[in-house]
Regions:
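A short acidic, often aromatic-flanked loop/helix-cap motif at beta-alpha or helix-coil junctions
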Residues: 59-61, 120-124, 269-273
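Short beta-strand-loop/turn "lid" adjacent to the catalytic site in phosphate-handling enzymes
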Residues: 78-134, 170-176, 181-182, 210-221, ...
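Short glycine-rich, Thr/Ser-proximal phosphate-binding strand/loop in the N-terminal lobe
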Residues: 28-71, 81, 172-197, 202-203
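Phosphate/pyrophosphate-binding loops at sites that engage ATP/ADP/AMP, CoA/4′-phosphopantetheine
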Residues: 69-87, 231-243
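ATP-binding/phosphotransfer module of carbohydrate and carboxylate kinases, centering on a glycine-rich
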Residues: 25-30, 188-308
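Short, low-complexity intrinsically disordered segments enriched in A/P/G/S/L with frequent Arg
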Residues: 4-9, 13, 17-20, 293-294, ...
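Short glycine-aspartate micro-motif
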Residues: 28-32, 89, 153-157, 246
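Phosphate-binding/catalytic loop of phosphoryl-transfer enzymes
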Residues: 111-192, 221-234, 267, 296, ...
Length: 308
């Protein structure tokens, strides 16, 4: 009788709480501010649920970025399960707009974002001359790769610049290599050389080109693959052992099939790295004390979650 009633009530309350939780898409908002684009990722339980991009505009205000982000999130809303950002993590190689996007992150989560810097926990020891000068995206790639692949490891990110990062067997970030990016080099050729056309990216069939376009494609795409193979070989010689190679970046899909060194291609390396750094650095119970986070309802409108 009476003795069983509290037990039934507790069970049903817990059941209701679990069902309410299932109705929300709780995510971490990951923001990667690059030279060309700002990537926004929604990460849930270490899995990347979505990635969207907007142009990097150095003169844009926080309000202008927020208007753009509202559109992106409204487009990705789920009709039954509103998205809720319970925290945010941000990395930037464009200091002029870091503050504006950190403000956006606060708006969507109600909390200060984790901002990537050499001061936060990464699982790495910095073994370079100026740790603060290391590109934050390079740090994110290296931290995730070192935590998830055999050491030593080399990560290569093919973006506006092509960057190599090296972590040795003792988890020391040793530095790396920075080169002009594949598309940057192609664009420069088209702009600086009057007789050279703009070339559409693809994977060249062979090294020897038989027309201007195939020569340029070979030089840029196959040339990048040869650069990766040759540079990793030199790095391995300096480390004194073979290294794991992980390649990422929007242009990697054209290059990785042409590389001869064994590699893993992970287009989501940086987003996964941001999720890892959030886990390592966010305060315990981040966001639960004040009922945190904000929801996107069926109309995609932002609505604050009531703390009670």
């Amino acid at each position: 009788g009476a003795a069983t009633r509290p037990r039934v009530r507790r069970k049903s309350a817990r059941h209701i709480m679990l069902r309410a939780t299932e109705k929300e898409l709780n995510m971490i908002l990951a923001i990667d501010i690059g030279n060309t684009t700002v990537a926004l990722g929604g990460i849930r339980d270490g899995r990347v649920c979505f990635v969207a991009r907007m142009d990097t505009v150095r003169t844009r205000t926080a309000a202008e970025y927020r208007a753009e982000m509202d559109k992106i999130f409204a487009h990705r809303r789920h009709p039954e399960r509103p998205m809720r950002f319970e925290g945010a993590v941000l990395t930037s190689v464009v200091p002029q707009i870091t503050g504006a996007l950190a403000e956006c992150a606060r708006h969507y989560t109600g909390k200060t974002p984790v901002i990537v810097s050499p001061d936060i926990r990464t699982g790495l020891t910095m073994g370079v001359d100026e740790p603060r000068a290391v590109g934050k995206d390079r740090l994110v790639d290296a931290a995730y790769a070192a935590a998830n692949f055999p050491l030593p490891i080399v990560t290569v990110d093919l973006g506006t610049a092509t960057t190599f990062n090296v972590v040795d067997k003792d988890r020391v970030f040793r530095g790396g290599v920075i080169c002009p990016g594949l598309s940057t080099g192609l664009r420069a050729l088209g702009e600086r050389c009057a007789q050279l056309p703009q070339v559409h990216l693809g994977s060249p069939k062979k090294a020897i080109g038989t027309n201007t376009e195939s020569c340029m494609l070979s030089g840029s795409v196959l040339g990048t693959a040869v650069l990766i193979d040759g540079m990793v070989q030199r790095i391995e010689e300096e480390l004194g052992s073979p290294a794991t190679l992980v390649v990422t970046g929007g242009l990697a899909k054209y290059v990785t099939p042409l590389c001869r060194h064994p590699l893993t291609y992970d287009p989501e390396l940086l987003m996964k790295g941001l999720a890892l750094l959030y886990q390592l650095n966010a305060p315990q119970e981040h966001g639960r004390r004040h009922g945190g986070g904000r929801h996107y309802g069926q109309q995609g409108r932002l609505r604050a979650k009531h703390p009670h």
